[in-house]
Amino acid sequence: HMDDYFYPYPNPGEDFPDHVSFAQYGRGYSNKADWRRDNVNVLIKEIHETVRECKPWVKFGVSPFGIYRNKKNDPNGSDTRGLQNYDDLYADVLMWINNGWVDYNIPQIYWEIGHPAADYDNLIHWWAKHAASRPLFIGQDVMRTVNKADARNPLQNQMPAKMKLQRSLPTVQGSCQWYAAEVGDNAGNYRTMLEKEYHRYPALIPESPFMDDKAPGKVKKVKMVWTYEGPVLFWTAPKAKDEMDKAVQYVVYRFDKKEKVNLDDASHIVAITRDHFYPLPYNDGKTKYQYVVTA
């Protein structure tokens, strides 16, 4: 994973001192901005190719600054007035996405809904439209979210409105919270809301069919065994000849004895594990359950 640091964030009136490098290694470019973008493009492309060659199951992605380009500089840009990936950091994020050089994208939309220069609502719709060819997650600023009131409901912060926006856009697959310490400290009840409202149930890693579209085989020999610590569910990994076909994680579901099995209902997930076993809860032995294990 790479964060948002490509060329340095610019200081007013200062240029990055790379004129000697440009003169020596310009590769025929007459425009320094194009040369800088190409330097970053080459880096991203070569990292992607190296990861694919060495460990093709590993994902490589970025979390770029939240504005690609302003509409003032590009008709396809966002209706914003701020620093730009393309023009100021020399990071052509859309090129990386469209060429398949990154496996996911997490734009840092750290502003609030209604920000005069970089409106969260505006930006999330822009990224959802223009960066949908790779998994898209939204980078969220926890403190700015909880410290800003919802314009439609001033008694609450902007977390509910932002979550509603995310979930209304089919190409947005989730969000990342910045930074973790503020989630851990439960700033503005953020962690409580995640646990009780938005992420009550475990989530599976989104599919990446552009990397591998073949699911692992079915688990084998699922059985319950009594141990000195109580009942344990065991299973055997499916066979796989290729590294890409190996099962990495297993999902354990639990249903009532006569309940219809529905693997699309995340409320029935009791474990996501890399182990080949799961200790079963045991109360009085009278309540019966069905367990399903998938790879």
Go through each PLM region and give its residues.
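Short S/T/G- and acidic-enriched coil/turn segments that sit immediately N-terminal to beta-strands
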Residues: T273-P279
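Solvent-exposed loop/turn segments flanking beta-strands in beta-repeat/beta-sandwich domains
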Residues: P238-D264, K288
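P-loop/Walker A phosphate-binding loop and immediately adjacent motor/lid segment at beta-alpha junctions
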Residues: K32-K59, A117-T145, A203-E207
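Polysaccharide-binding and catalytic clefts of secreted carbohydrate-active enzymes
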Residues: H1-W101, Y110-W111
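Substrate-binding cleft of secreted/luminal carbohydrate-active enzymes
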Residues: Y90-P116, A131-F210
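Pro/Thr/Ser/Gly-rich low-complexity, intrinsically disordered linker/stalk tracts
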Residues: N189-K246, G285
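Short, contiguous acidic/charged loop-to-helix segments that flank catalytic cores in large enzymes
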Residues: G82-Q84, Y110-H115, A240-D242, H268-A271
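Beta-strand-rich modules
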Residues: P279-A295
